[in-house]
């Protein structure tokens, strides 16, 4: 397994990895948009796979990704994305709230607070809402899982979002973050 030059250096600490997660996830989700389908096809397919994993949509080959917009640290929410999908001519809108955890546990009822902010912002008749916690931990502590379940969040270790045992994409940035050990 190759080691990531992007995510690991000689520092004793790795800086603020959660901020890096916000930026890379934002970029990854936006690269799933159909406007990038021919530019770097392997990268596009990988980004689609990640987006549909977070949306919990299987059998997505027929779905077109019309647009993806992302916001980092909106109302203290790590990342949120608006996605417009075209399923056989029917436009469907999805919004994802993503909380990432590298070091710290969920605290101060934050998942429920963020969910409430999100739900007050979106009209449920127009948007399908998704709540996701992504952690860099290989094993998610049971207390974190319980808090996610209680708040209606799906939870994933980073390697469950996308396995690093894939062929290289056409993007060094993607490869360094998603396909290297760090």
Annotate each language-model stretch with its function:
Residues 1-182:
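Charged, terminal alpha-helix-loop-beta segments
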């Amino acid at each position: 397994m190759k080691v990531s030059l992007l995510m690991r250096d000689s520092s004793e600490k790795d800086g603020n990895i959660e901020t890096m997660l916000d930026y890379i996830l934002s970029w990854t989700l936006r690269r799933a948009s159909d406007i990038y389908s021919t530019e770097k096809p392997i990268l596009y397919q990988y980004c689609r796979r990640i987006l549909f994993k977070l949306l919990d949509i299987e059998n997505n080959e027929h779905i077109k990704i019309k647009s993806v917009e992302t916001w980092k640290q909106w109302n203290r929410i790590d990342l949120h994305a608006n996605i417009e999908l075209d399923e056989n001519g029917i436009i469907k809108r999805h919004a994802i709230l993503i909380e990432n955890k590298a070091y710290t546990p969920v605290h101060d009822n934050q998942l429920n607070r963020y969910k409430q902010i999100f739900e007050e912002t979106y009209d449920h008749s127009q948007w399908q809402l998704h709540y996701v916690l992504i952690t860099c931990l290989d094993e998610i502590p049971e207390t974190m899982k319980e808090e996610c379940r209680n708040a209606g969040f799906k939870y994933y270790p980073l390697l469950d979002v996308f396995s690093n045992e894939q062929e290289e994409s056409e993007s060094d940035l993607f490869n360094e973050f998603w396909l290297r050990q760090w």
